[in-house]
Amino acid sequence: MQLLEERILTDGNILGENILKVDNFLTHQVDYRLMKAIGKVFAQKYAEAGITKVVTIEASGIAPAVYAAEAMDVPMIFAKKHKNITMTEGILTAEVYSFTKQVTSTVSIAGKFLSKEDKVLIIDDFLANGQAAKGLIEIIGQAGAQVVGVGIVIEKSFQDGRRLIEDMGIEVTSLARIKNFENGNLNFLEADA
């Protein structure tokens, strides 16, 4: 997605050897116009897939996921990273390790929001090692629902996340694919949409 790649080049900050900071339009402050455009691209890509739910994980996946859900006219569900006292029964959970934060979290979704009839599109802000997507795939599987695809805003293609998901037989659609970070710059691969 050219608009997204241009925004990354303009406003993204490279930290260290493999961290891209995009807090001024995605991970802290949200550019809703860009998120709306991202949502439309995912909706067009999966228009014929019969998506019934969009699922993400809190927090930075929520903005692109809600706009994708709006464009598809389906509900959006986000997995919670912290135990909530109001979620007391029928909870679907998975362990997710965050390489960025160096912690393992138990993420959860109330089972009443997913059923075996659902066709789910997972949306997330980043794909690196694939652990967040893997955890969501596990949760959706516990409900007996079908994961149709995984939509990613920014993929770090030099890490193993895409391979992990595709090895499960699930399609990955990334709107910006980073080949590498080199001398304080980044290089893109061709995006999926």
From Swiss-Prot:
> So which domain of life are we looking at?
Bacteria
What CDD domains has UniProt attached to this entry?
PRTases_typeI
Give the EC number.
2.4.2.22
Sorted UniProt keywords: Cytoplasm, Glycosyltransferase, Purine salvage, Transferase
Annotated xanthine binding sites: 20, 27, 156
Q: Which GO terms describe its biological process?
A: purine ribonucleoside salvage; xanthine metabolic process; XMP salvage
Localization, per the record, is: Cytoplasm
Q: Does the keyword DNA damage apply?
A: no
| Class in the EC hierarchy, top level | transferase
Q: Is Cell cycle tagged as a keyword?
A: no
Family assignment from sequence similarity: Belongs to the purine/pyrimidine phosphoribosyltransferase family. Xpt subfamily.
Subunit text: Homodimer.
Q: Which HAMAP family match?
A: XPRTase
Q: What is this protein called?
A: Xanthine phosphoribosyltransferase
List the source organism.
Answer: Streptococcus pyogenes serotype M1
